[in-house]
Amino acid sequence: MSFLVRAPFSARVLPLAEVPDPVFASGVVGDGRALLPDDDVTCVTVHSPIDGVVTKLKSHAAIITSTRGPSILIHLGIDTVGLRGRGFAPLVEEGDIVDAGTPLIHWDLGPVRGAGLSPCAPIVVVNPPGEPVSPEFDEALPTVGILDPLFSLPDSD
């Protein structure tokens, strides 16, 4: 049995190696995939990709930890911490219990694009460290809808 991670929003799927940030691209944070919203998308509601607990929440990022073990980082954009929250509206708090599909953050892409930053959003397994993931989408058509299967990893049970 495997642990399934779903897409938190509709977007084009990229391998981490294509993320314009050397830390994410090298896989040092963990394995996963990245989502790139289409150019005509102006706002995104980011949903939890798994059932779990919001263990860390910043305006531009969240970590959801499953009761089954894995922790998933959703990082919205590259170098977006410098926006100091502009364009991000958290909809949950740390400690909240969420289901896959629970809205986490409302993301206005205007400030990201206006600052010349990349809206590329890494979705990464941060725990267990070094755990490789398997794609769960059609790599020939690398787009996903909200809550479509994105990737899986071996179940820790």
Per-segment meaning from a language model:
Residues 1-157:
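Contiguous, well-folded functional domains in the mature portion of proteins
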